[in-house]
Amino acid sequence: MTQNSQETVIGRITSVFGVKGWLKVFSYTDPKDGILNYRDWTLLLDGKRIPIRLEEGRRQGQGIVVRLKGIDDREVARTYCGAEIRVPTEQLPELPEGEFYWHQLEGLDVFTVEGECLGKVHHLLETGSNDVLVVHATAGSIDQRERLIPYLPDQVVQQVDLKGSRMVVDWDPEF
């Protein structure tokens, strides 16, 4: 999930499904069908914001399919393909202490326990065993390398300071 201002991206429309205007959705929520808990969406497509309501949805194989209010034709549905699905950030459930949404980690400065700047969290990857921080170099980092750092709280990630916009990791900069 990524955040823009007071909205968080929770998925994207990938393609049409069937002939009655249903759409396939790639969900960024965990679990995947958690996206169906949000009824009022804002779609962002080609720079345009489109408020729309989720009428119904369900799991279909490994993915999610949805029907949006006012869309009951395959060709009309096709015009929404590629849209980001956004919801107000305030609607996201509060997480337990020490847990974070990905959008909260994106943009944090990353430092080693020795105080060396490795860069800034650009985005995260889901690998199956654990999430991975993709850290891009910044003007203040020790070099210009991109780093992939496992997001393992208490093992690799020692501290997350959202207010200070920084993260401390136990990570060898040479790795």
UniProtKB/Swiss-Prot annotation:
Domain PRC barrel residues, every copy = 97-175
Q: Give the Gene Ontology MF terms in alphabetical order.
A: ribosome binding
Assigned GO CC terms? cytoplasm; ribosome
**Keywords, ordered alphabetically:** Chaperone, Cytoplasm, Ribosome biogenesis, rRNA processing
Which locations, inside or outside the cell, does it occupy? Cytoplasm
BP terms from Gene Ontology: ribosomal small subunit biogenesis; rRNA processing
Principal subcellular localisation of the protein = cytoplasm
List the transmembrane segments.
none
Q: Which Gene3D superfamilies match?
A: PRC-barrel domain, RimM
Question: Record's SUPFAM superfamilies?
Answer: PRC-barrel domain (SSF50346), Translation proteins (SSF50447)
Q: Does this entry carry the keyword Cytoplasm? A: yes
Q: Which family does it belong to?
A: Belongs to the RimM family.
Outline the subunit composition. Binds ribosomal protein uS19.
What is this protein for, i.e. what is its function? An accessory protein needed during the final step in the assembly of 30S ribosomal subunit, possibly for assembly of the head region. Essential for efficient processing of 16S rRNA. May be needed both before and after RbfA during the maturation of 16S rRNA. It has affinity for free ribosomal 30S subunits but not for 70S ribosomes.
Tell what the record comments on domains: The PRC barrel domain binds ribosomal protein uS19.
The protein depicted here goes by the name Ribosome maturation factor RimM
Q: Which organism is it from?
A: Marinobacter nauticus (strain ATCC 700491 / DSM 11845 / VT8) (Marinobacter aquaeolei)
Q: What is the lineage of its organism?
A: Bacteria, Pseudomonadati, Pseudomonadota, Gammaproteobacteria, Pseudomonadales
